[in-house]
């Protein structure tokens, strides 16, 4: 079955292996294909074992089966309800890989449940990276995940998603060992080995958990809110609302027991509606509403859409007011039309809410750009938004207005008090 002295063990309908060795050794799942990368795989195993790591090699090879892995291609196919001959007979790399991804994820979690993984290391090109990171993304935050990949220097969102995956650029093609790749692969192995040695499975906290989205332009408010809530013994997680940040917040809502959410920055919705760079997609904030998590919405950072360089901003959003944030990003001032689109969208989302929702609107400005010291200040817009959002929610949720700026202590205090009210009602 393999060359590492492990006894066979039946798990469900799939014959896996009983992994021997000192129980105190951290266990790392190594995902690598022996049919195309035998030399690199052996090198990574040696690097890990040299650090006192017990390696469990999962081999999702499709072309042919090579002896040596604890988890063979046949086991992976069987876990997906088929066999390797049927997988190969598909004669389509995408369809074949989908089967192997299903089996690999199932077996990885069975191994973790039985053995207790302390990390995952993988190496691959586009196909290997797609499969390995699908396994990594199925594991919770905190478990070390390192992907050595030829895809690491490009567009990595499809691979990383909202997870804590470390992408290591392979530099060269994964085609043998040379003076560069030896160092790169060893560094990747040592990285996951170090993390695995220090890994501790998370313990469930008894503290209330509040999630909050913000940008630098509403950071003053978020800092005041976070500090006040932490003084009350509440755990606060803050997310940067640049698209992936809000989507990560949504994912954590799905996976954890969240007490309340403060949506202090709705720029991801504004960008979704108007083609900005930081879109959170059509489902942003839907998770908390459908789950019934108490939620506070603030039109923070809705005074602008995030565009690219100033030339692009002029071309895409002509006739607007602009603030050059840096060479790569321009804030484009929103007006009544854009705010109306946001109010309509938010009203539709809130219509799906299964728990309490409150809206807080600061009448003196929505961000540091929308302030007397900023470049996009417009006091006429907050009252317009109040009318729009009040009409959109049609009395279903309260709309609170405060004649202060978003980045003031008074506004932060109001948000804190609302969160505490939610918590006390649940208790």
Which residues make up each language-model segment?
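Gly/Ser/Thr-rich loops at beta-strand to alpha-helix junctions
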Residues: 33-39, 118-131, 211-221, 242-244, ...
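Phosphate/nucleotide-donor binding subsite
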Residues: 67-116
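Glycine-rich phosphate/diphosphate-binding loop of Rossmann-like nucleotide-binding domains
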Residues: 37-49, 56-74, 205-255
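A C-terminal functional module that forms or caps the active site or interfaces directly
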Residues: 350, 354-356, 360-393
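A glycine- and small/hydrophobic-rich beta-loop-beta segment
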Residues: 267-344
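Short Gly/Thr/Asp-enriched flexible loops that form oxyanion-binding sites at enzyme active sites
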Residues: 124-141, 222-225, 371-378
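N-terminal phosphate-binding or glycine-rich loops at protein starts, especially the Walker A/P-loop
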Residues: 2-64, 119, 129-138, 142-147
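Short, acidic/small-residue loops that bind anionic groups at enzyme active sites
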Residues: 131-160, 169, 237-241, 284-299
């Amino acid at each position: 079955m393999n060359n590492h002295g492990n006894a066979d063990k039946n798990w469900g309908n799939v014959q896996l292996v009983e992994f021997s060795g000192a129980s105190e050794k951290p266990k790392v799942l190594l995902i690598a294909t022996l049919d195309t990368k035998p030399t690199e795989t052996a090198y990574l195993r040696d690097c890990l074992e040299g650090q006192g790591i017990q390696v469990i090699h999962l081999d999702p090879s499709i072309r042919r089966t090579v002896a040596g892995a604890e988890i063979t291609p046949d086991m992976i196919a069987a876990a997906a309800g088929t066999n390797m001959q049927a997988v190969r007979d598909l004669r389509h790399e995408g369809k074949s890989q989908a089967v192997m991804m299903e089996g690999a994820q199932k077996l990885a979690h069975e191994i973790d449940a039985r053995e207790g993984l302390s990390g995952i290391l993988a190496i691959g090109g586009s196909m290997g990276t797609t499969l390995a990171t699908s396994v990594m993304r199925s594991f919770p935050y905190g478990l070390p995940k390192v992907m050595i990949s030829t895809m690491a220097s490009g567009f990595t969102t499809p691979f990383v998603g909202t997870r804590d995956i470390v992408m290591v650029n392979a530099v060269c093609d994964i085609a043998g060992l040379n003076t560069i790749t030896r160092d790169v692969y060893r560094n990747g192995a040592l990285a996951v080995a170090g993390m695995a040695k220090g890994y501790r499975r998370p313990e469930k906290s008894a503290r209330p958990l509040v999630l909050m989205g913000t940008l630098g332009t509403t950071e003053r408010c978020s800092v005041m809110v976070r500090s006040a809530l932490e003084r009350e013994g509440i755990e606060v997680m803050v997310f940067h609302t640049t698209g992936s940040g809000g989507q990560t917040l949504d994912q954590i809502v799905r996976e954890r027991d969240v007490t309340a959410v403060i949506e202090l920055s709705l720029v991801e919705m504004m960008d979704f509606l108007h083609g900005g760079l930081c879109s959170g997609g059509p489902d942003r904030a839907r998770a908390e509403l459908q789950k019934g998590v108490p939620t506070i919405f603030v039109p923070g950072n809705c005074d602008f859409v995030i565009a690219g360089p100033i030339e692009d901003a002029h071309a895409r959003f002509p006739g607007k007011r602009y603030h050059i944030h840096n060479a790569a990003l321009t804030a484009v001032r929103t007006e009544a039309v854009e705010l109306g689109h946001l109010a309509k969208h938010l009203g539709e989302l809130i219509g799906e809410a299964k728990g309490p929702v409150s809206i807080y609107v600061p009448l003196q400005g929505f961000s540091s750009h929308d302030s007397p010291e900023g470049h996009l200040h417009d006091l006429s817009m907050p009252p317009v938004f109040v009318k729009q959002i009040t009409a959109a929610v049609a009395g279903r949720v309260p709309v609170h207005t405060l004649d202060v700026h978003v980045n003031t202590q008074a506004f932060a205090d109001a948000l804190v008090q609302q969160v505490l009210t939610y918590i006390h009602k649940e208790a």
